């Protein structure tokens, strides 16, 4: 996730008005340096993967520094082709478009996947992005079919898209019936776009229903969100509020807060319903005003982790929030959101977080 989100932040920034002040010139230099670095780093990664032949999708590195490749049904499979697409958008170098198409088209069968909710990540990052820049009928069809597949997970009586199946794996051991995780907000853009492309309002209505139920049940009074809310699919009653990846059920998992800020910003983009933007702002304020947020604005992996300041940082969460901030500035231009996003990008661009050239598996962030 960290690859895609940094590039998204850079791309959103470069589409803002021309820089005219010294501070803006400074961040412009940072961004241009990051783009140059990203092209060199990803060129090295493609050499490692292979520019032709069998498609292998990178996800991370193991403890020995070796590349970890994933099957196409892994939830992260769309991030690498999406990153290649952003490099094409940022450089206008068609070699990146060709590679993005190659890795994107390897995910063709995912449009029919119905056993988990992450198709929004997988197809949204890949097909939806490349369709914006290189539209064709096959890509459009894949986007709409993926939305149709995702909607099979919509539990009408509860009004939500079920995130995980509970009949196997570790999810079957938690006592859940219809778990919904905050990550699911990142799937809704795909549904909104499917309605725009097809004219079928079904996808839009599912997205709005899910956003509303999540707004109603997933957030605390301070604006932070639970990771998992388990529903009774027969009547929509909330059965549990827990975590799967945070420190504790009542803690604030950093990436989950980022999903919420970004997800509700996107919902506002499509619907112009102010309650979505208000929730994005409320969760953002929780993050930015949290006493455990470091000065460089890169959060610890959980705001309530027990060993702060000796806890890992979450660069992916910071990059996701930076991307949301650049967009939120379009809607609330007097709130200083661009300056906050610039601070995050400067931090992520520093040696503390940006990988050395040719190191870290040729990923961008450490």
Q: PLM ranges: what are they?
A:
Residues 1-29:
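Bacterial Sec-dependent N-terminal signal peptides
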Residues 23-366:
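Glycan-recognition and catalytic cores of secretory/periplasmic carbohydrate-active enzymes
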């Amino acid at each position: 996730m960290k690859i895609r989100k940094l590039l998204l932040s850079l791309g959103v920034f470069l589409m803002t008005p021309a820089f005219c002040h010294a501070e803006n010139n400074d961040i412009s230099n940072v961004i241009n340096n990051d783009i140059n670095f990203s092209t060199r780093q990803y060129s090295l990664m493609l050499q490692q993967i292979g520019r032709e032949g069998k498609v292998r999708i990178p996800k991370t590195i193991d403890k020995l520094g070796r590349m970890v490749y994933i099957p196409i049904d892994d939830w992260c499979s769309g991030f690498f082709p999406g990153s290649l697409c952003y490099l094409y958008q940022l450089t206008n170098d068609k070699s990146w478009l060709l590679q993005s198409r190659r890795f994107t088209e390897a995910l063709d069968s995912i449009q029919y996947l119905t056993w988990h909710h992450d198709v929004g990540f997988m197809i949204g990052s890949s097909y939806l992005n490349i369709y914006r820049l290189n539209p064709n009928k096959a890509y459009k069809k894949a986007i709409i079919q993926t939305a149709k597949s995702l909607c099979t997970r919509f539990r009408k009586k509860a009004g939500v898209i079920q995130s995980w199946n509970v009949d196997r794996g570790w999810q079957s051991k938690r006592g859940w019936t219809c778990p919904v995780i905050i990550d699911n907000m990142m799937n809704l853009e795909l549904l909104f776009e499917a309605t725009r492309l097809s004219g079928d309002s079904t996808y839009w209505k599912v997205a709005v229903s899910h956003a509303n139920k999540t707004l109603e049940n997933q957030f605390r009074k301070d604006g932070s969100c639970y990771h998992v809310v388990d529903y009774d699919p027969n009547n929509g009653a909330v059965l549990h509020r827990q975590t799967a990846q945070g420190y504790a059920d009542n803690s604030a998992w950093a990436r989950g807060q980022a999903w919420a800020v970004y997800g509700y910003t996107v919902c506002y983009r499509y619907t112009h319903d102010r309650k979505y933007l208000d929730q994005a702002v409320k969760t953002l304020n929780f993050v930015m005003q949290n006493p455990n947020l470091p000065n460089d604005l890169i959060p610890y992996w959980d705001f309530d982790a027990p060993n702060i300041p000796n806890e890992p940082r979450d660069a992916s969460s910071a990059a996701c929030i930076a991307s949301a901030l650049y967009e939120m500035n379009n809607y609330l231009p007097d709130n200083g959101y661009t300056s906050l996003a610039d601070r995050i990008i400067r931090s992520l661009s520093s040696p503390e977080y940006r990988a050395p050239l040719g190191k870290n598996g040729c990923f961008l962030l450490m």
